[in-house]
Amino acid sequence: MEATSVFRPKLGSQFSLPSTTNLFPLRKLYGFPLTSFPGKPIKRIRLKATNTLTFDDKERTRKFKKLPLSEWTHYFHSIPLDISEMDALKEEIDELKPKVKNTFMSSQGSDSTKTKILMIYLFVSLGLAYHFEEEIYETLKEGFENIEKIMAGEEDLYTVSIIFWVFRRYGHYISSDVFQRFKGSNGSFKESLIGDAKGMLSLYEAAHLATTKDYILDEALIFTSSHLETLVATGTCPPHLLARIRNALSICQHWNFEVLVPLDFIPFYEQEKDHDEMLLKFAKLSFKYLKLIYLQDLKILTKWYKKLDFPSKFPPYFKDRCVENYFFVLPVFFEPQLSSARMLLTKGFILLGIQDDTFDRYASISEAESLGNSLKRWAPDHSMDKQPEYLKSVLKVILDTFQEFEKELSPEGRSYSVKYTIEEFQASSKANVELAKWAQVSHVPSFEKYMEVGQMEITACVTVAYILMSMGKTGTKEAFEWLKSRPKLVQSLCTKGRLMNDIAGFEDDMSRGYVVNAVNCYMKQYGVTEKEAFKELRKMVVNTHKTLNEEFLTTTCVSHYVLRETMDFARMIIVTYNGYEGFTRPDEGKIEEYMTSLFVDHTLKML
């Protein structure tokens, strides 16, 4: 096979080396185990390659894709905000909250716990769970102690599926054997279930909480997906339920942002005949208040961002994504009281974007090495004075912003969190330099070697560190040490982030001649087509879903809150790369639609 036929399209020079090359020795640099990924037997391919690596470090006309500035920043910087409206909403919420709580806690009868669990699902879906965290915790703790009694004799598919979903969502390991009751004598799910559209949808949602050993949930996903797709195609159920099924097939509730779910669920619930008017009103008030809090945050954040004046300091190679970055922190910190955490994490994301774009899209090798060395020293290296002004600005904004973090967190006695996060940022920068060297000479390493470096370059570890840094006292030293140990949950996050980014960003990478990508590395190593590579990489992504679920349920060395926010980061990855590159091209997928719904639209009419 000719080397030039392995990659499509042929853009610039294609360069690779056999996997035995010692020019890029495989080192355990980043704490990841050097295990092989599943794939086909290696098939040797002849590649056109030079004998030595050469770097052209002279100033030259750079080839980079100019990225347009975001229109969102100016919009929120100048938008008016009515504080009196926020105060009025808060007053109504405070008046209704105890009434809703009383309805939840006063459930009586033999099925009272079951009724409460079903209501917890409504709380989560309507965006209200944060109002009743203690009550939910106590209810599920008590319920889990009596799970066998609760499930005994329950034959309603919707009820069993929702109870399963709620317990697993909150970290309680309920066995998937509860679904055996819905199988016939032939070992397959009963055909009679097909007529229960809500039950089928709930089983479909429950199947996404599968672990690596929940084979019955694999069967359930196949069974429900095919029949739900038929329902959508034929339109044979109520329109409001049909819309919900269509949304679920696009992205299941478990892997969606918790704050995005109410956008669809509130209108759905309103059209349910048995909906609770008080609960519906409480959901609408809470969601409207939440949106106003976000506007308040964005006014403050965009003011900070505009003062930095990045467009005057950097060439237009970087992704101008202040408001978009704020959107991407919402799966982790969406509750109204967490404004400070959102601000901190958004600023961290902005730094990661500048770092990544500088290494990935613009810097020469000497510039990349100088920036990498400076970040390693956490001060300008000896060559920085000779570098272009833009690079000095990149380094300055990173160092200054971390100094800002230190100033904010030091009074809380949390300087250690900044130190740990800097270490992860430095490790990420080191990986960026390695990838930049490969990219500039179109070197395509083995898949395993690429993943070792690429998993760190994708910034999943430093993102978890940012999350811990932003969490307040819950982000303990022990939590950071857990991160440093590279537990299986974190490894799966890194794999998921790397693969989903590379799958969704493949077209963009190739269009600019950037061949260092998991797809190309897999094609080269295993001698497969692009289509086959995509198929295998997507299988790996699905496996990470199951591993994440499993680790969330079984990890005991850190707090549930840390695990929950880490899982929320996984949700960010999935929504961002759900069939499109949502960060680089937010206008081409659903990201812009989501942002408009959360930050601009006020379509949830009040009762």
Swiss-Prot record:
Domain comment as written in the entry: The Asp-Asp-Xaa-Xaa-Asp/Glu (DDXXD/E) motif is important for the catalytic activity, presumably through binding to Mg(2+).
Binding locations of Mg(2+) 2: 356, 360
Protein family according to the UniProt entry: Belongs to the terpene synthase family. Tpsa subfamily.
UniProt motif DDXXD motif: location: 356-360
A cellular-component GO term for this protein: cytoplasm
Location relative to the cell: Cytoplasm
Main localization category: cytoplasm
Purpose: Involved in terpene biosynthesis in roots. Possesses diterpene (C20) synthase activity in vitro. Does not seem to be involved in sesquiterpene (C15) biosynthesis.
Listed name of the protein: Terpenoid synthase 9
Residues the entry annotates as binding Mg(2+) 1: 356, 360
Record organism: Arabidopsis thaliana (Mouse-ear cress)
Cofactor: Mg(2+); Mn(2+)
Expressing tissues: Predominantly expressed in roots but also in stems, leaves and flowers.
